Amino acid sequence: MSTVTFFNPYLCGPRKPRAPSAGEGGAEGAAAARARAASAPFLQIVPRGCLYDGERGLLKHNCALAPRMFFRDRPYVLSKDLVWPTLPPPAVPASTTERAPRAPAPSADLLFHMYDQAETVVSADSKELIHPGYRHRITPCGVVLRLFGRTADGASLCVNVFGQDAYFYCRYGDAQSLHDRLYRLSDTLELAPVFHVRVRRVQRCSIYGYGTRPFADLYLVACGNWHVLKKMGQCLLDEGVEVFEVGVSPLTRFLLDKKIPSFGWCRLRRWHARPAHGRLSTAELEVDCEVADVRGVDDVAWPLYRCLSFDIECLSGGGAFPVAENLDDVVIQISCVCYPVGGTEEQRAAFPVAERHLFTLGPCAPIPGVLVYEFPSEFELLCGFFTFFGRYAPEFVTGYNINNFDWRYLLTRAERVYRWPVAEYTRLRFGGRFCAYVPGGGGRQPGFRTAQTKVLITGTVVLDLYPVCMAKVSAPDYKLNTVCELYLGRQKEDLSYKELPRAFLSGDAGRARVGRYCVQDAVLVKELFEKLNYHYEAAAVARLARISLRKVIFEGQQIRIYTCLLEEAAARQMVVPTFRSGAQRGAAPGAGGGGGEETTYQGATVFEPTVGYHHAPVAVFDFASLYPSIIMAHNLCYSTWLRDDPGTPARPPETPARPPETPAAGPSGAAHAGGVPGATFRTPFRTPAGVPAAAAGGAGAGPPGGGAVSSASVGGRAAVSPSETPAEREPEPAPEDVFVVHVGQGVSYRFVRENVRASILSELLRRWLAQRRAVREAMRECEDETRRLLLDKEQLALKVTCNAFYGFTGFSQGMLPCLPVAASITTIGRDMLSRTSAYIEAHFAEPAFLARFFEPGDLPRADEPPPTVRVIYGDTDSVFVRFGGVRAGAIVARGEDLAAAVTEALFTEPVKLEFEKLFVALMMICKKRYIGRVFGSDALVMKGVDLVRKTACRFVKTVVRDVVELVFRDAAVAEAATRMSELTLEEMRRVGVPAGFHVLLQRLARARDDLFSGRVETAALVLSSVLSQDVSRYKQLNLPHLAVIRRLAARSEELPSVGDRVSYVLTAGPPDGRANAPNYELAEDPDYVAAHRVPIHAAKYFEQVVKAVTNTLYPVFPRGVVRRDRFLADLVPKRVYLGDEFKRHARPVEEEVCESERGGSGLLSSLDSSR
């Protein structure tokens, strides 16, 4: 079309733009607009379809006029001083050049809620307007902490805290020598010349090991330049100097030393308000204070915060999936949904900002309920979005996969394409950070991060729901549509990225359609945000661990435990050592710090299960918080571990990767009765009458106080500091005050008991568990729905953190690994499980014991077989107990009493065995794989079967579920399954397949018919695999999901990111292809298969059905069958399927009748081939 449909004052030269009037663009007038018109020129990129409907291509033009937007046919010049037309006017001027009324002098404490923090190093020559009373804190330089939050009356606030130093500890000969060495290091490392180091002697002992008194040569090294100090500490560590707590940031020091909640209410005793012209932040109120003036307040309530959910749409110039670095791949629309978080219901109802906003290139038809802002070019669109972001100033930003795509795309376009810095749109006018980056060069480090890309915006917390949903829900894929269906019960109106360009370029109505789609995504994310309430959960963890909210979001659980240990160690006048990275990776701590053989230790016990279909009550007992209770019961900790040499090691003893679970001989075998061989220990457990001494755990386990193994026994002897003398060591505790754990192979670890030194880990766990009980009690009494939600997230944070302690000590790449603690925990856990199993089998079937818990009517009559009790399975912290002849309802009623009897007989507090559930029928397949029906419920509990695996397609899951339902619901099928499991193959050849089993075979035949007849929709046949790393890093390239990615790339379609599940369908392949072609040759993208009607490979899918059913019904098949999948396939009635070219010559026939249904045994004629 030749008609211009959108007035672009830059691309349409003959037409003169109307200058904004005094009332347009907020406070700006014509003179201001003319002044900005002389701003630096910028590149305009706009799709031709925005000016000429339906046309493709881009228009590019260098423009010297000021960027602007159009809202309701009125132009607005985009500048730092713009008052956004649809937002409430700010309480303070947007520019520092305009003065605001002075804040009143502080006459009382200032109460505020803090949600985010930033740490900066400020030097004495800084241009920042700092009150003279705080100047000495930054001379020559010093750390300034910026605390962002809101006051009690809802005003945004920035608190500048002065006087917080960064520091670490180290052992050295004398202070002057250490001082001189640090300054020499600064010359070597070419560090910043402006800094001052302070060294003073302190009295502390190490948390790592029991046996030393406070060091006589320990010094605290403090510095106002945090970056310099961190490098100095690392250099000392690399040179072999014993250092402690290197890398702990000044913000962490502030939160721990002052007991400040990282997300919560605080109070300022003294403060000084900055005038408007001297403010560094864009907050309504900015104050300065000393570090000693900040106090924490115990209150979990939230003020009203602003949240923004957004989504972007892009247009590729070449028709492929958009790439931000390509000049022609432009951003065409951005949707924003503004809504409140926290506060009271009345405050949320009075939220003054409109909810839905759309930023679009070109003219757009009106969209009901959406404020539409139109822009002449991409640069102005980005400028408008970031200006809106700065004016709205949200405390929280959310979206779906915004870290890996949206933010990275926007920042790349702004900074690389247009060379336009966006840091000025943070909460700080200068010195803020607005960036997206991948730590460690893009590789994933398990246990440290929950998201690959980190997005840092000073004063704004970014909460991407994509990694949150991946961690919280099991789904075949994690597309927004799938997640919304799971959580919200509805799907979005989808618009493919191939259809999107045509709609956008078609005209105003098409852009409105794309806009509705774009806004819809942001709205769905907002609803997911409010449904998941992950922000409340993350805030509770941040308060508990005293770490920033962004660390909870982007870091793993290691940092949470580490900061808690730092706080508790400081309260006990202890320091936490810093180890070399080689030791953390599992390198043997040899004298040279070189690599050594990696050590392993025995993991949790998994009993060999009694495989089969158990049509009798099976009770499940498990230990409540097994590993935390072991730590508390036995006083295990870094600080209670008795080493051969109490001197602090230069690196930790060898800590391996997380151990595999250890198989045991079985519930009834010798290893089960006597515990794990070579893994006994001296224990305070009581040995009940009737239980063998070996099963009771460690009689004669070693000489008192003996058997300890130094770090030399696990890869290298720890070095003893030359400055430590025997006189500085604690005296050796008495033998009765030492708890010895023999972990096998001649290795033992010793720990002092609680009366000698209380375990730090135990103290933390006891405190948190008591706090969790108090919170749950408060929940029961709480009637306010919002407060109840906050309390629930708090108790969940306490639970998750408590359960993370074992992983913290046992993770070889962690921040403070410790083999003695981790190995001792698993050793004690294995013994507890073995002792529990032995006690149950020795006592539960005794008549006297049963009479204590059950009524005569619950047990068999005198003329019936006596009751039987047998442990059929055990896994880490739970045992499965099969009761024969006992009424199921009675077991449920007295289950807790049975568990309490075991606890009382075997264990000491806080160890507690609990009754979890009762299966009325259980199919035990193998280790970690079973299916059972729970008493009082129709629901089936499944573990490890294809029904709950993400890799299986929906069609296979449906067939397997139907088969399982038949086995557990249909009495005839259940009886046939039980009968078949009791037969041998030879017996079955003589008597035939049990009659009830044919119902199951008919279901398989129907599934085969559906596949070969093309009656299964493509969506039900989708398989998926995780893209765990970049495609180029795979050694095995012949994988189906990698083949799909290569096909997508060849067609220039959207490619998945690392961590995504890649979906694919197995197609029939070319007609002349191999019959047994590998899956990677047949894998294709599901959307491509559906769009082009590509036939699927029915035989391969039926093969998957048979294998999945075989794996699920593994215990049902006769004994002696080796190829069970082939055996099952031979049982299914045979059928020949005609191709399309033959179907018109065929006539329908009735369903075939299985030969064995007519009484014959011909069905088994081909079973010999399955042997």
Curated annotation (Swiss-Prot):
UniProt-listed SUPFAM superfamilies: DNA/RNA polymerases, Ribonuclease H-like
A GO molecular-function descriptor: DNA-directed DNA polymerase activity
Biased composition range(s): Low complexity: 663-674, 709-725
Positions of the UniProt region annotated as Disordered: 647-735, 1149-1171
GO BP annotations listed: DNA-templated DNA replication; viral DNA genome replication
First-level EC class: transferase
Bias kind Basic and acidic residues: ranges: 1149-1158
GO cellular component, as recorded: host cell nucleus
Cross-referenced InterPro entries: DNA-dir_DNA_pol_B, DNA-dir_DNA_pol_B_CS, DNA-dir_DNA_pol_B_exonuc, DNA-dir_DNA_pol_B_multi_dom, DNA/RNA_pol_sf, DNA_pol_B_thumb, DNA_pol_palm_dom_sf, DNA_pol_type-B
Reaction catalyzed: DNA(n) + a 2'-deoxyribonucleoside 5'-triphosphate = DNA(n+1) + diphosphate
Compositionally biased region (Gly residues): 697-708
Location in or out of the cell: Host nucleus
Keyword annotations from UniProtKB, A to Z: DNA replication, DNA-binding, DNA-directed DNA polymerase, Host nucleus, Nucleotidyltransferase, Transferase, Viral DNA replication
EC identifiers of the protein: 2.7.7.7
Listed Pro residues bias regions: 649-662
UniProt record similarity statement: Belongs to the DNA polymerase type-B family.
PANTHER family: DNA POLYMERASE CATALYTIC SUBUNIT, DNA POLYMERASE DELTA CATALYTIC SUBUNIT
Name recorded for this polypeptide: DNA polymerase catalytic subunit
Gene: DPOL
